[in-house]
Amino acid sequence: MQAKVSWQKKMHFVGRGDSGHEVHLDAKKEIGGEDLGARPMELLLMGLGGCTGIDIVMILDKMRIAYDRVDVLLDAKRAPNPPEKFTEITLTYEIDAIDADVDKVIRAVKLSQEKYCSASHSLSATLSAVVVVNGQKVYDDRANLPE
């Protein structure tokens, strides 16, 4: 896999990967950016959410679980000093499923986190999961709830 990020002006860059799609990146105005794109750390977080989200949809489809909504909310904590890397990331999976087998939905999330999501395996931050099915929290590995 390859990507190229090209400077445009000030702190604005345009990235393009093997897929050919462009992504605009920029810094906040306070440090010289013009707010013309997402921040690099936001993209890292969105990439993680997209990676695990795609896994979840594929796994739910294979399990023949129908769903109306799959949202992945990511809450990241960063170190206070440079390089201000992510130290903890909580992923909350909000899934509206029709006649859902909650255990299978939790299994789909665990498979993504433990086996399939290459983005999560590329990060050194501590990751934790919360699963919400049809508006009800059914799993939270931060609270050591029963699996």
Where are these regions (language model features)?
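Extended beta-strand/beta-hairpin segments
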Residues: 1-46, 57-147
